[in-house]
Amino acid sequence: MKKTATQSSPATRVERDTMGELAVPATAYYGVQTARAIVNFPISSLRFPRGMIRAMGLIKRAAATVNQSLGLLDKKAADAIKQAATEVVEGTLDAEFPVDIFQTGSGTSTNMNTNEVISNRATELLGGARGSKLVHPNDHVNLGQSSNDVIPTAIHIAAGEMMQQQLIPALTCLQKALARKAREFDKIVKIGRTHLQDATPVRLGQEFGGYARQIELGIQRVRHAQEALSEVALGGTAVGTGLNCHPKFSARVLAIVSKETGCTFKEAKNHFEAQSAQDSLVEASGELKTIAVSLMKIANDIRWLGSGPRCGLGEINLPETQPGSSIMPGKVNPVIAESVTMVCAQVIGNDVTVTVGGQAANFELIVMLPVMAYNLLQSIELLSTASTNFAVKCIDGIKANEERCRSLIEESLAMCTALAPEIGYEAAAKLAKDAYKSGKTVRQMAKEQKVLSEKRLTELLDPWRMTEPGGPVGSAGG
């Protein structure tokens, strides 16, 4: 006789929820609601990352501690929940979180997935059978909580902790690498470029100093994002009113989580804002997008400066990391910088998703939390790994091609800018055009036309002098 969905077999057990019975894998720690979510959402291969699962475990563990201290949960159940939640925090039970990212917009399936895993593991620790609900997923593990406040809180915790432990150290590594190159290249003068056209000289160290400052500002942006994420929804329960939650619950839970993560989290000043909108996630994603824009600019500049080896700009030499072509022998490409640009494109796209998610709030709840979480946390991870890789495998190994820098400066028609304050803008422009038509340098043409004494030309056409403020005052071009 064919088995129905509710009949058990040696490989399954039958669990019941408010919608009826369903077979669950016998060895699974998750339960019936997770099993329903697996059936309902066969959408993608995307799952919540480790940081989010860890954050869920942190909340549930702290909740058990606080509920016990408030006299709402007996010590036996609380201790079992805390031990099971610790296994979630440490990643031992990661395989028990199979729910797709594209699920219920509140993330209820993932909250119940967490509740069921901790419930069944805690029940097992107390000598009960999985599925027997000796420790109940709702009454005990989810006590004083709702998916509507737990999921947004977990997103904030995961993002804040990942920023602190991964992104800020990675950006600091990159900023220091760029700053070292700025000092190393400070004496090397090269041609500047605006609109991809020759401009007045600049020191290679000044360019790298600009890059270092961009990343320094990026670190500040991450800290601003952390501050925006510090207010969390926990304590608002279903719609922000705090129904079925002890008034001291949220503050005590967040004090524990803050201590364990090294990040500051506090109860939202207004729970209706914290649950009906996620402007803080949109803000944080926007900060990450800005960092991606900075990295895109830096990586593209590095690619251009290292283009060649014989027919490009060639002002710097990039580390050779791998063969660049399957058909052109000896070709080496700027693959690390290219990798960074693709990461930046992904982060910018992720920001669009987070923005759309932020718009998807109706009344008391935002209903795109899982996809907002996935994209935000992916952006943090990608920027972290790409920044460290960029620093170690590219920036640290860059060498300046000093001879190439010198030769390009002398060939530049923009050198005439230094003469404009003394001979006038129009005369300097004519000099540049004459030099271009004749194939001569500005220096050669200026000597030939005797626009100034040779001594004065030598002074004014000193490339180093052009990289510092001062000298005759006049229009510097546009």
Question: What residue spans do the PLM features occupy?
Answer:
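Conserved, well-structured ligand/cofactor-binding cores
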Residues: M1-G478
